[in-house]
């Protein structure tokens, strides 16, 4: 009988010790994520090179942090096809499916996801957002406005103006096509308006509300300018091949905002590496998924050093000789124009 009582007591003590050990791990706020499978939703606003690079970089950043698609990560990727209504539906579906995290690529998708997840515990990580403050995703001091964080692709506007002036010393008028409903584009227009006179440029802008407006808007603005420069405007960038064709027909150079635009025929750009921006964002998302930080605790980040890209073939087609000083500072220079 004593032996039986002893065994019962020993079993009870073992169970109690095991329970205490488990509770101790939870109380420290740490957890074993090695065996956890994550489910995330990626909402990309439009299909074009810079956003595609951002998405691919995001997946790489997660993988470098030990969260690998096909192993411990399931990705539900959706493209809004440059339609805000689609972005809203995608975000609502992600919330309904109770994903572990929403990744939003470009401002309209981020704003849709933020609103959809507002009353949930689902964190939002955004990327390719030019102005998180204007999009109400961050405060002026960089802090989050909710369970949200991410990275900004704010354009180096002054550096772009310097590059344009160096390459086109006789140019007087810059044109910008932009989507009136994209907060990121509106913010950049204001910055161009402020800085263009400093480099002896006059600015002409033409707003569109949808992709269908772009052919006529491009025809209109090309009658008024010496050069076009692109923003990270999703609707406009999606139609860049059309814009380039129209500009080339009038022998008007087009400056891009990142590498993919220069590859397909823009003359040059001061911009960022969207693949690297995506990697940076993926690593932020991994910290949140692993419980190492909350989205609300991480200020948004940006890549500070712009890169220089030039396309010598585009210059030759336009009869523009690229200064050696520009070639010397170029991160990459292209001798061909990729098919669009």
Annotate each PLM feature.
Residues 131-173, 272-293:
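Hydrophobic alpha-helical segments within soluble ligand-binding/sensing domains
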Residues 39-65, 76-85, 181-185, 235:
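Extracytoplasmic "Venus flytrap"
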Residues 21-23:
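Bacterial signal peptide processing site
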Residues 40, 58, 149-196, 299-314:
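An alpha-beta-alpha
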Residues 79-139, 233-248, 252:
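Beta-alpha junction/loop-to-helix N-cap segments that form part of ligand/metal-binding clefts
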């Amino acid at each position: 009988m004593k032996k039986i009582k002893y065994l019962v007591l020993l079993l009870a003590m073992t169970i109690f010790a095991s329970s205490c050990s488990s509770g101790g791990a939870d109380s420290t706020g740490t957890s074993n994520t090695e065996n956890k499978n994550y489910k995330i939703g990626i909402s990309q606003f439009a299909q074009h090179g810079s956003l595609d690079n951002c998405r691919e970089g995001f997946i790489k950043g997660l993988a470098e942090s030990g969260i690998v698609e096909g192993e411990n990560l399931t990705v539900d990727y959706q493209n809004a096809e440059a339609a805000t209504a689609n972005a809203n539906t995608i975000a609502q579906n992600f919330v309904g499916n109770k994903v572990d995290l929403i990744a939003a690529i470009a401002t309209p998708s981020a704003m849709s996801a933020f609103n959809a997840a507002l009353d949930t515990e689902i964190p939002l990580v955004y990327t390719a957002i030019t102005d998180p403050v204007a999009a109400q995703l961050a405060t002026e001091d960089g802090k989050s406005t909710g369970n949200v964080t991410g990275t900004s692709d704010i354009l180096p506007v002054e550096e772009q103006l310097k590059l344009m002036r160096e390459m086109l010393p006789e140019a007087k008028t810059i044109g910008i096509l932009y989507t009136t409903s994209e907060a990121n584009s509106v913010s950049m227009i204001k910055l161009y308006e402020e800085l263009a006179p400093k480099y002896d440029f006059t600015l002409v802008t033409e707003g569109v509300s949808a992709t269908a407006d772009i052919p006529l808007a491009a025809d209109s603005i090309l009658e008024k300018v010496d050069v076009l420069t692109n923003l990270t405007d999703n609707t406009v960038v999606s139609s860049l091949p059309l814009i380039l064709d129209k500009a080339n027909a009038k022998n008007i150079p087009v400056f891009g905002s990142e590498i993919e635009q220069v590859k397909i025929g823009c003359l040059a750009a001061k911009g960022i590496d969207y693949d690297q921006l995506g990697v940076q964002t993926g690593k932020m998302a991994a910290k949140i998924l692993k419980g190492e930080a909350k989205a609300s605790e991480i200020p948004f980040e940006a890549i500070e050093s712009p890169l220089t890209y030039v396309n010598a073939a585009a210059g030759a087609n336009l009869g523009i000789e690229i200064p050696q000083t520009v070639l010397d500072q170029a991160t990459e220079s292209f001798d061909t124009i990729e098919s669009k």
